[in-house]
């Protein structure tokens, strides 16, 4: 069910599926085998094999990284690396020679570095780098990082395995497979990716917390860890498993050098400021370039010597271990393992890693020409009784220059056995220039331990699983070269009394359960390696002696298993990063689609109301025009009707005037003739004047009546139009209110919908994180089970060896003790021969009882060891389960906090939106009321203009529509 949900989360719709893309720096139309010739295999990385290739035309060498990809999505995972390599042209960064995608395989051709990786060089030479060599590497790495960070690129996987060497003594920064190329200068990342031991604290936190992203300062932390790795061969906390080291990085103080006194103050100060847990105060690469530790570097001679030594011709000579006299040396050379256990527990080292793998170094007789001197200071200090006391290199780790013990953990690595017993002697012979101090100072003799593992570094150079040695902390500076060379030879000439040391040695081995050196020395061999090389005309010869045993194969196997474990974790990281990228892409697409849909919905709603308003205005205009037309028609008809009536009235009025004239005539005719003429004349004049006055008054009254009728008609039309305009404005404002209300409702709905989508996306993101975390936890449990199984098998094998070896030891010891007892009886001469035989018989019976007790003690010890181992394995699993549960609980708790914070943020946004909505509503109402007032003002002004007296020829106007209708 969970997997189905996981598939659902990452599923894209049909139109969202990506098609094949053409990339700028990847050729698809060319078979790389036609251009390059494969010469051999260089190594096997986490995502594919690396081959040495040669260009068929130019003869240029390249490292071909061949990766099988199943889909375009997988191909895109490597495009970032190709683009970074293609755009980074820097002398200390590997160059891209070409990239091909052909037949389902991606070929990345990069610059070939014959010197190999720095971690492989340390394995080959059985030692770390000297401080001058570290200075040059650090300087060149800082210049490369400054260039990368200037291009907004975060490497995210800095370590010695990703620093390649050229024969000219320059480095090449490689492996950009997990690098990030930002689009903005201040952009930060939240991907949990990289190799655990080198991760910065802010990167570790991103495993469960994505809200605390990191930037390019994470590379500065990895640089500091890499410098410690080059000084001590292994990174800090290498003895812990990857899950525990993540907690260690996040909760502990920044790591430091195990033996700070062996290194300069500049180096220690550089590490102190580079390994700052606060990324805000951590310096940048440009600032670190001004530090005194690297600012004085002007030559790469130290690295040229290093590469020359690593690539030098090696002559090996194997000598069988001697049985005679070696047992005595072994007794005095073996340190008490109890001290090791105490040192380990005091420093918090895992008991499961220390219970059966205590470091034991045995000494090798030195040539007579070399003086026998202590190793690293007070190695052979006289004990209280005057007898010499030898200290192994493992004990030297926990002592300072004054011989006092300091809390330094044993140099071991889970889950690798480090029982290898190594003694290294270096002899340098300078033939051309015998007084060349620089060459001698740069390669001081070392006392080495077996390197537990190679930290599983997938590099583009040669990955060598050499039987290298682990240098004790501190590649010496010139100030310490004399002390280091004086301590390079461990004296083995002193021996203890055989009779007293034999039983002590046996009891020590039986008590601790460790392998007896007397038995193991019979099978050990001494490997002598002589390297001869020339640097600047100076021939240098270095001879290294190392005791090899069957544990070498065990160490190599453990180293390989550790590489496999880290490779599995890195594959999980890569897949997790791919899933996170796909999910982020899907979420961005969902948000983009949602915003686009929101815009479309809002635009559609606005368009709907705009169309409604437009229709309303058009209808209003049409209605007003129709009303004006109707008004014009009514005016004409009314005017015509009134004129007709007035014409009839006028005709009647004329008739009345005629009657009046006739009456005047009749009244005049009754008068005398003489008077009649005078009266006729005066009556006609009076009648004419009266007629004119009456006619004028009648016409004026008719005109006034017509004007009053037209004004009344116009006023009625104006009132109708005003009512229509008011009604239209009210409808328009109601539409505007509905429009704004709909938009506000959509905005609120969109806020809710966006919140739900973001909330669901957050849940999907945490679901994916839980899914990836559970897969990682399952892989860690699987690795822990394999580790516990290996520990059980190793314990069983060791117990079987001890059980088989005990009878031989008892027989030899019994013969020796019997001979010594008989010799003591003979010397003392006590009693007769029969008494002596009786004493011998009693002594023999006591020896049988003692040997039987030893066998029972060994059996009990083996049972206790097995019980302790089972308990330890269960404790390891329980501790791992507890840590995983805490991490899951932390992830769930963080998810709850994020969801709560998201809800609170949404509620706050909704509250702010509602607070802003009130003034928006108020502004809308004010605007609508203002438009109403403006309309009423316009109506009033129009009415006043209509009532003002006008000239007879001037037509009254109310609206522009009626201007042509006044007639």
Curated annotation (Swiss-Prot):
Regulation: Inhibited by the pyrrole-indolinone inhibitor SU11274 (K00593): intercalates between the ATP-binding Lys-65 and alpha-C glutamate (Glu-81), resulting in a partial disordering of the lysine side chain. Also specifically inhibited by erlotinib. Slightly inhibited by gefitinib.
Positions with biased composition (Basic and acidic residues): 835-866, 902-947
Changes after translation: Autophosphorylates following homodimerization, leading to activation of the protein.
Binding site for ATP: 42-50, 65
Database matches in SUPFAM superfamilies: Protein kinase-like (PK-like)
UniProt-listed PROSITE patterns: PROTEIN_KINASE_ATP (PS00107), PROTEIN_KINASE_DOM (PS50011), PROTEIN_KINASE_ST (PS00108)
Subcellular location as annotated: Cell membrane
CDD domains recorded: STKc_STK10 (cd06644)
Bias-annotated ranges (Polar residues): 339-364, 378-393, 431-454, 486-498
Top-rank lineage group of the source organism: Eukaryota
GO biological process: intracellular signal transduction; lymphocyte aggregation; protein autophosphorylation; regulation of lymphocyte migration
Gene Ontology CC annotations of this record: cytoplasm; plasma membrane
Modified residues annotated as Phosphoserine in this record: 13, 20, 191, 438, 450, 454, 485, 514, 549
Boundaries of every Protein kinase domain copy: 36-294
This protein's record includes keyword Cell membrane: yes
Gene Ontology terms, MF aspect: ATP binding; identical protein binding; protein homodimerization activity; protein serine kinase activity; protein serine/threonine kinase activity
Membrane topology, from the record: Peripheral membrane protein
Primary location group: membrane
Ranges for region Disordered: 317-454, 468-498, 827-866, 902-967
Name of protein: Serine/threonine-protein kinase 10
Naturally occurring in which organism (per UniProt): Rattus norvegicus (Rat)
């Amino acid at each position: 069910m969970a997997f189905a949900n996981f598939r659902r989360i990452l599923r894209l719709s049909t139109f969202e599926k990506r098609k094949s893309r053409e990339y700028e720096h990847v050729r698809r139309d060319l078979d790389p085998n036609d251009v390059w010739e494969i010469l051999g295999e260089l190594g096997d990385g986490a995502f594919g094999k690396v081959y040495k290739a040669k260009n068929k035309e130019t003869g240029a060498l390249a490292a071909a990284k061949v990766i099988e990809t199943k889909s375009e999505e997988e191909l895109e995972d490597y495009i970032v690396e190709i683009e970074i390599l293609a755009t980074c042209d820097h002398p200390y960064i590997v160059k891209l020679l070409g990239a091909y995608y052909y037949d389902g395989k991606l070929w990345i051709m990069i610059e070939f570095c014959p010197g190999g990786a720095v971690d492989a060089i340390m394995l080959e030479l059985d030692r770390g780098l000297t401080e001058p060599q570290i200075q040059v590497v650090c300087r060149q790495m800082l210049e490369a990082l400054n260039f990368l960070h200037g291009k907004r690129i975060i490497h995210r996987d800095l370590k010695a395995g990703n620093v390649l060497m050229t024969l000219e003594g320059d480095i090449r920064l490689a492996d950009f497979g997990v690098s990030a190329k930002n689009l903005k200068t201040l952009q930060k990342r939240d991907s949990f990716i990289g190799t655990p031991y080198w991760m910065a604290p802010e990167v570790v936190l991103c495993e469960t917390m994505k809200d605390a992203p990191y930037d390019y300062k994470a590379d500065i932390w990895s640089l500091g860890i890499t410098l410690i790795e080059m000084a001590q061969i292994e990174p800090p906390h290498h003895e812990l498993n990857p899950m525990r080291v993540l907690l260690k990085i996040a909760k502990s103080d920044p790591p430091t050098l195990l033996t700070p006194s062996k290194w300069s103050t500049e180096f220690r100060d550089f590490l102190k400021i580079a390994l700052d847990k606060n990324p805000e105060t951590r310096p940048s690469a440009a600032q670190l370039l001004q530090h005194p530790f690297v600012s004085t570097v002007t030559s790469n001679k130290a690295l040229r010597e290093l590469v020359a030594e690593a690539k030098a011709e090696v002559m090996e000579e194997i000598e069988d271990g001697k049985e005679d006299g070696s047992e005595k040396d072994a007794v005095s050379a073996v340190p008490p393992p109890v001290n090791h256990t105490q040192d380990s527990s005091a420093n918090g080292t895992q008991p499961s890693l220390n219970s059966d793998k205590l470091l034991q170094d045995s000494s090798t007789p030195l040539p007579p020409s070399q003086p026998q001197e202590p190793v690293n200071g007070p190695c052979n200090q006289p004990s209280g009784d005057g007898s010499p006391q030898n200290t192994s290199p493992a004990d030297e780790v926990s002592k300072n220059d004054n011989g006092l013990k300091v809390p330094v953990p044993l140099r071991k690595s889970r889950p690798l056995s480090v029982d290898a017993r190594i003694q290294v002697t270096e002899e340098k012979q300078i033939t051309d220039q015998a007084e060349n101090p620089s060459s001698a100072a740069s390669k001081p003799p070392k006392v080495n331990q077996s390197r537990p593992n190679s930290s599983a570094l997938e590099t583009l150079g040669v990955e060598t699983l050499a039987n290298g040695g682990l240098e004790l902390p501190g590649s010496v500076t010139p100030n310490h070269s004399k002390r280091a060379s004086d301590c390079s030879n461990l004296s083995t000439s002193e021996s203890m009394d055989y009779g007293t040391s034999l039983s002590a040695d046996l009891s020590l081995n039986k008590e601790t359960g460790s392998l007896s050196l007397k038995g193991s020395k019979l099978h050990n061999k001494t490997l002598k390696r002589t390297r001869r090389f020339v640097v600047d005309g100076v021939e240098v010869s270095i001879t290294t002696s190392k005791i090899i045993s069957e544990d070498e194969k065990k160490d190599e196997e453990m180293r390989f298993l550790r590489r496999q474990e880290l490779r599995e974790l890195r594959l999980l990281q890569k897949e997790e990063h791919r899933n996170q990228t796909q999910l982020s892409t899907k979420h961005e697409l969902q948000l983009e689609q949602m915003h686009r849909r929101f815009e479309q919905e809002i635009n559609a709603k606005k368009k709907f109301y705009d169309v409604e308003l437009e229709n309303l205005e058009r209808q209003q205009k049409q209605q007003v025009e129709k009303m004006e037309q109707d008004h014009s028609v009514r005016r004409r008809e009314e005017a015509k009707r009134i004129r007709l009536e007035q014409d009839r009235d006028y005709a009647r009025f004329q008739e009345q005037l005629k009657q009046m004239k006739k009456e005047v005539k009749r009244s005049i005719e009754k008068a005398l003739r003489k008077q009649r003429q005078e009266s006729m004349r005066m009556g006609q004049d009076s009648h004419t004047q009266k007629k004119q006055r009456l006619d004028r008054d009648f016409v004026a009254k008719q005109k006034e009546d017509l004007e009053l009728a037209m004004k009344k008609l116009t006023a009625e039309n104006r009132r109708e139009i005003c009512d229509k305009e008011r009604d239209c404005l009210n409808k328009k404002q109601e539409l505007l209110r509905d429009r704004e209300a709909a938009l506000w409702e959509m905005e609120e709905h969109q806020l809710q919908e966006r919140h739900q989508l973001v909330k669901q996306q957050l849940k999907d993101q945490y679901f994916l994180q839980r899914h990836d975390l559970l897969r990682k936890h399952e892989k860690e449990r699987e690795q822990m089970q394999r580790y516990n199984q290996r520990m059980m098998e190793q314990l069983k094998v060791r117990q079987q060896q001890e059980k088989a070896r005990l009878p031989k030891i008892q027989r030899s010891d019994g013969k020796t003790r019997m001979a010594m007892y008989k010799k003591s009886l003979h010397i003392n001469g006590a009693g007769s021969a029969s008494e002596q035989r009786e004493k011998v018989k009693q002594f023999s019976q006591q020896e049988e009882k003692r040997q039987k007790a030893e066998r029972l003690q060994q059996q009990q010890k083996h049972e206790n060891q097995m019980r302790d181992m089972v308990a330890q394995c269960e404790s390891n699993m329980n501790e791992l389960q507890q840590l995983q549960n805490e991490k899951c609980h932390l992830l769930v708790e963080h998810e709850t906090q994020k969801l709560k914070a998201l809800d609170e943020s949404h509620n706050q946004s909704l509250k702010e939106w509602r607070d802003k909505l009130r003034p928006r509503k108020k502004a809308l109402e004010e605007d609508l009321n203002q438009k109403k007032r403006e309309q009423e003002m316009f109506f009033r002004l129009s009415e006043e203009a209509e009532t003002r007296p006008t000239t007879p020829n001037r037509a009254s106007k109310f609206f522009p529509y009626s201007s042509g209708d006044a007639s």
